[in-house]
């Protein structure tokens, strides 16, 4: 398949090294352009948890003539059998992998010795399996997380824009995306929430089904509440109110959440008692040492809103919302401990689902390999027919030239042409039959013989 992957992730390298190896922004465009000089297509996936280079070893360096002439063999030719094309191909691919590693070290101004212990390498079907596991979220820090598939798609689009996605690599990418979709659809590996922000958003969908008509109140604009707000906004909530001590941070979050179909308002924390009555959903995570929403404030807000249900999510430690609020009818209060308990159960469910997902990945890789072999055989047949036509045309032109000479004997020329055509057409199968007989490969021998007999019967 000629596919190789070289990379680091959260399991193999510390964050300090991952930061130094990250390929982002203009670095990716430059890197893709440079990789094109010695690869038949490449895709770079770089996130906070991984940097990976997916590349195709050039077909030209794996051609039979190039294999034997390659300078890469000089390093290890004494330790391999030059009669083994498999060993030679493996050596060439290893040399190419080393070339990519060296390039990466140079590109990031690091030494190869510095990064090599942390790099992992996969090739051919192992590389395909790895790519599918990554796309399906099976190799993520958070098992089954869906964001990685979107990150890979963006990486592929960037490779397309930079003309770095060859036809074969594009075909492989399509297979990976289709297979990853099947893993997610046919298993439960990504079905349950395993982050606080995602779990909070899941609660919203369980209690409210008419989100465009609902209001979310975000109390404090820190990172955790930002994630919660982003998740709930993505579900289609119609109005968001942000209360924060720092108006600049509140405005920054409002800018992220702003949408023509969504109303966004920024209020001060002092206005919290007044705006609480307008909220169907409250998410609070302030870091304050004091209670921000007590039972009295909640009862007043509930009365003002005619006792319509309220969902309150308290992600703060210490708590922002008085725990006695949970005793009020029509108020659903969830603390960080409540969500952690839900997440713990969901993580275990994902682990169990991952067993099924890994089995499905193995099956899908076998299917992809078969499709690739069929695709490759079609290409090989086309090349074989093209070479055969070239040989026949060459012999025919030589014979025509001889026929135009003085004292040409057409009968002798035609006999010679027939003999040479026969030799050319029977050379490869004859060589294969002798090799099969010499190595005791009766299955291959029977296959070739029966194939030739079928060919004779049909002609």
From Swiss-Prot:
Its EC number is 1.2.1.70. The active site is at 48 (nucleophile). Keywords: NADP, Oxidoreductase, Porphyrin biosynthesis. The record marks 130 as: Important for activity. Pathway: Porphyrin-containing compound metabolism; protoporphyrin-IX biosynthesis; 5-aminolevulinate from L-glutamyl-tRNA(Glu): step 1/2. NADP(+) binds at residues 220-225. Substrate binds at residues 47-50, 140, 145-147, 151. It catalyses: (S)-4-amino-5-oxopentanoate + tRNA(Glu) + NADP(+) = L-glutamyl-tRNA(Glu) + NADPH + H(+). GO terms for molecular function: glutamyl-tRNA reductase activity; NADP binding. GO terms for biological process: protoporphyrinogen IX biosynthetic process from glutamate. It comes from the Bacteria. Pfam families: GlutR_dimer, GlutR_N, Shikimate_DH. PANTHER family: GLUTAMYL-TRNA REDUCTASE. Belongs to the glutamyl-tRNA reductase family. During catalysis, the active site Cys acts as a nucleophile attacking the alpha-carbonyl group of tRNA-bound glutamate with the formation of a thioester intermediate between enzyme and glutamate, and the concomitant release of tRNA(Glu). The thioester intermediate is finally reduced by direct hydride transfer from NADPH, to form the product GSA. Catalyzes the NADPH-dependent reduction of glutamyl-tRNA(Glu) to glutamate 1-semialdehyde (GSA). Possesses an unusual extended V-shaped dimeric structure with each monomer consisting of three distinct domains arranged along a curved 'spinal' alpha-helix. The N-terminal catalytic domain specifically recognizes the glutamate moiety of the substrate. The second domain is the NADPH-binding domain, and the third C-terminal domain is responsible for dimerization. Homodimer. This is Glutamyl-tRNA reductase. It comes from Psychrobacter arcticus (strain DSM 17307 / VKM B-2377 / 273-4). The gene is hemA.
């Amino acid at each position: 398949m000629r596919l190789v992957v070289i990379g680091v992730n959260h399991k193999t390298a510390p964050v300090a090294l991952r930061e130094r190896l990250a390929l982002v922004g203009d670095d990716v465009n430059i890197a893709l352009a440079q990789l094109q000089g010695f690869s038949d297509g490449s895709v770079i996936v770089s996130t906070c948890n991984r940097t990976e280079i997916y590349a195709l070893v050039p077909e030209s360096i794996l051609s039979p003539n190039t294999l034997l002439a390659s300078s890469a063999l000089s390093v290890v030719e004494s330790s391999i059998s030059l009669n083994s094309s498999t060993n030679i191909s493996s050596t060439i691919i290893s040399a190419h992998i080393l070339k990519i590693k060296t390039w990466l070290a140079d590109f990031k101004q690091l030494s190869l010795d510095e990064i090599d212990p942390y790099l992992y390498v996969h090739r051919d079907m192992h590389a395909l399996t790895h790519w599918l596991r990554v796309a399906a979220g099976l190799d993520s820090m958070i098992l089954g997380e869906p964001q990685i598939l979107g990150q890979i798609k963006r990486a592929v689009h960037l490779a397309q824009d930079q003309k770095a996605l060859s036809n074969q690599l594009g075909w492989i990418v399509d297979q990976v995306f289709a297979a990853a979709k099947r893993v997610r659809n046919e298993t439960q590996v990504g079905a349950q929430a395993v982050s606080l922000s995602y779990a909070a958003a899941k609660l919203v969908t369980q209690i409210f089904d008419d989100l465009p008509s609902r209001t979310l109140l975000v109390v404090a604009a820190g990172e955790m509440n930002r994630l919660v707000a982003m998740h709930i906004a993505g579900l289609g909530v119609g109005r968001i109110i942000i209360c924060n001590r720092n108006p600049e941070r509140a405005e920054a979050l409002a800018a992220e959440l702003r949408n023509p179909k969504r109303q966004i308002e920024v209020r001060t924390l002092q206005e919290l008692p007044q705006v609480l009555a307008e909220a169907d959903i409250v998410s609070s995570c302030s870091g304050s040492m004091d209670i921000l929403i007590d039972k009295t404030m909640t009862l007043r807000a509930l009365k003002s809103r005619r006792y319509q249900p309220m969902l309150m999510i308290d992600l703060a430690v210490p708590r922002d919302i008085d725990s006695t609020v949970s005793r009020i009818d029509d108020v659903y209060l969830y603390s960080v401990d409540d969500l952690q308990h839900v997440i713990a159960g969901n993580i275990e469910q994902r682990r169990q689902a991952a067993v099924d997902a890994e089995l499905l990945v193995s099956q899908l890789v076998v299917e992809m390999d078969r499709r690739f072999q069929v695709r490759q055989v079609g290409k090989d047949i086309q090349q074989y027919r093209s070479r055969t036509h070239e040989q026949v045309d060459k012999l025919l032109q030589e014979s025509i030239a001889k026929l135009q000479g003085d004292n040409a004997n057409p009968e002798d020329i035609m006999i010679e042409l027939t003999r040479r055509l026969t030799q050319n057409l029977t050379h490869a199968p004859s060589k294969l039959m002798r090799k099969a007989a010499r190595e005791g490969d009766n299955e291959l021998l029977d296959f070739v013989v029966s194939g030739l007999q079928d060919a004779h019967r049909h002609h």
